[in-house]
Amino acid sequence: MYFHITYSDLDINETHDDDLKDFLIIPEEDIFGQFVTHILDPNENDLYEIEPDKICKNPFSSSIYTNNITIKNKYSLLDANIYEILLSKGISKYIDGLLVWAINFNLLWLLELIYNYKPPINLKDREIYLNSNCDDINLIKFIVTRNDYFQINLESLLEYVDNKEIIIYLMDFIDTDKIVKYVIGNCSSEFFIDCIKGNTILTQEHIKLAVQNRKIPVLEHLINLGIEYDLNEIINDIKDFDILKYMLEIGNSLNEDNVNIIIFNIHTTQLIEYLMNLGYTINSKLVISMFSHMLIVSENTDIVEFLKSINAKDSDLTVDFIEYLLEDNFEKAKQIMEYFPGANTVIDCNLFLKYAIISQDIPNIEYSINKGADLKKYYKNILLTNNVTILDLCLNHCEINDVNNFILKIIENDCIETLKYLVDNNYNIDLLDMFQIMVKKNYYNPIRKYICEQIKNNNLLIPNLVEIIMNLFFDDGDVNWILKYNFEYQYKDNLDEIIMTIIIGDCDGAKNMIMNYNYTSDLKVLYAFILKEFPEECSSEKMDTIKFLLDFNADNNEYVQSAFLLSVFYTPLLKYFVEDKQIDLTVNGQNIVEYLISDGDHEIFRYLYYNGFDVKNNGFEIINAHNSNNECAITKLIESIKNNTYQ
């Protein structure tokens, strides 16, 4: 029994492969796996029971296709009959997937049907698949009351439930303390207060959970119940300002270690100012060390005044702290230099310049230059600003002699304004070298367009341009971005001119050259025609030219055989060989399949199979070919064409 899956609003003949017109089919033993992997929708998909014609088991994947089907039955995915048929036949492969699918769509009747047949399942550690419908009380009750079969870890269900009715229901089946702890962390405070009614034993552990989850009403309720706790044992869990305020307001106090822990955990200037107002001593070194990576500074906090208030000393000021200020506020950094003279040993004008360039702060770039900053240290940073004003300001003070050392970075960061500035100011920019970089690195950005325009406007001749274009073309690279500039081409020989004419898209011109220059039997010419994607209106002209070359070389067996191998890249040509020329695939198909193994084109393999090529009958072992050290015939042929070593 085989199946084909369709969309309900499509005719079955609209669901075949667009090119081959074949159908993806699923054997009965694999059908349950499709429900989850393809996320079938009972309202959008239908299931057809079909009789296949030729069955093609793809050697590169688990997919199975057929060239034609006969419809036997059509089933809705909500039709219990099809599941009854399959389960009664003992089909159980991928049953877990069907279960998950039924749960997702809340199909209790299907779950009941599966439960009645009890095929072997394994949902252990897979409770996550229940998350989509875990708030349905009927589904939960169904699973819990039949958990002798489903074997689901009920405690894990808590991770996906926030329904009060369900959680209270689960309290009869799960350890109450685990539920209470879950509720503290995941549900409202009011819900928690409802849950603990009864004989629930509450401890400091529950207070700690309330602190960790920042639940002040829960914390207040537990403390009002008289639950004992030791502040020193929960201090590391206090990471919320409001929680701390509550704990201090009810009479708790902090020792020196606790203050440092709290500052580290909550790390805001608001907290520090609050603690100072309560009379606590602040560790200025600790606070300053936190500025660069974690301290959250309130909007209304004056950094200089804040440092004064915590009694910061010159020696406390670190490079990280100063860099933080430079990144955030240059003016504050200047004020600190004035108020803390010792900061000048940490801050130098080069550090100022670095961050002024990064933030493109022109006044402070000028300030740094006037202070004697070394511009040479920051050539790269200056060039990557892509800011003409900054470039003009800096490069007027210090000219860059080795600008080409930074070209790659300029290209990578798409700094087109920088490049224009350098060209306009007569820096020695090697545009031809930049063009080679664009080709080699396959960069696509506005710089590429600018470089090509400059080369064109300056009438520069690109060395080996024809070779560059042909190499890109035969490696399936984009050449159109080069062709559109109509650069001057220098051909080494007539063959180069023919290939370039094909690449440009002049089919008639290429055909005339082939005849005039006597290249009718050249494989590189044929390969170029096969690879070139002509406009749709010229597609018949392309095929006619290829047929002309084949007819001209009809007595040249080696040429015809090579053309057949190359047809793997042009399906109309392959069909021409198979359907019009009726080439013997039992003799010739193996080389193509060898190439397809590495290329992964499943469609062409199926086409060959439907037209007579049989892997088994040809004694062709897919695994052996895949692991073989011997290069396949097509790969060898292509390499010989690219390297001009073909005959």
Swiss-Prot record:
Tell me which domain of life the UniProt entry assigns to the organism this sequence originates from.
Viruses
Positions annotated as ANK repeat: 123-154, 202-231, 233-256, 258-284, 289-319, 348-377, 401-431, 529-558, 588-617
Keywords linked to the UniProt accession = ANK repeat, Repeat
This one is known as Putative ankyrin repeat protein L764
Q: Which organism is it from?
A: Acanthamoeba polyphaga mimivirus
